[in-house]
Design a protein with these regions (language model features):
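Short beta-strand/loop element within the Bergerat-fold HATPase_c
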Residues: 39-50
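Conserved glycine-rich
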Residues: 101-103
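Conserved micro-motifs of the catalytic ATP-binding
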Residues: 9, 13-16
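Short conserved segment of the HATPase_c
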Residues: 60-73
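Acidic ATP/Mg2+-coordinating residue in the GHKL
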Residues: 55
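Short helix-loop "hinge" at the ATP-lid/N-box region of the Bergerat-fold HATPase_c
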Residues: 32-33
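Glycine-rich ATP-lid/hinge loop adjacent to the conserved G-boxes
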Residues: 73-83
């Protein structure tokens, strides 16, 4: 698909459940890869307390954004060839809530989506 992945390491370490946080990151990246067109870009950056995954994919309509974390909600993804169960972001929200972290999403159709993982609700930086 020839997608550019731009990853900016912070060099910071946060104490959290690595397995479940990795699950969330993988799910969000999977969505970004699915909905980013050939030649697109996915950026991963943050400051240690926040991780941002942003793409320049097809985006999500404003009326669908409030519901993307609901179980089974798929919304209109604009592409019939992209099947979705509507369970991925729901599970991400459940995991982040259990870890006492936050997850939010902003998007513009035709411009892409930005998912913010807020680890600052309960976190400690490791020096």
């Amino acid at each position: 698909k020839k997608i550019t992945l731009d990853f900016q390491e912070t060099g910071k370490t946060v104490l959290t459940d690595e397995k479940w946080l990795l699950f969330v990151v993988e799910q969000v990246l999977s969505n970004a890869l699915k909905y980013t067109p050939e030649g697109g870009t996915i950026r991963i950056y943050g400051d240690g307390a926040t991780v941002v995954i942003a793409d320049n994919g097809i985006g999500i309509r404003e009326e669908d954004q409030a519901r993307v974390f609901e179980k089974g909600y798929t919304g209109y993804n604009g592409r019939a060839d992209k099947k979705s169960t509507g369970i991925g972001l729901y599970l991400c929200r459940q995991v982040m809530d259990r870890l006492n972290h936050g997850i939010s999403l902003t998007s513009r159709p035709g411009q892409g989506t930005l998912v913010r993982l807020d680890l600052s609700r309960e976190w400690r930086m490791v020096e």
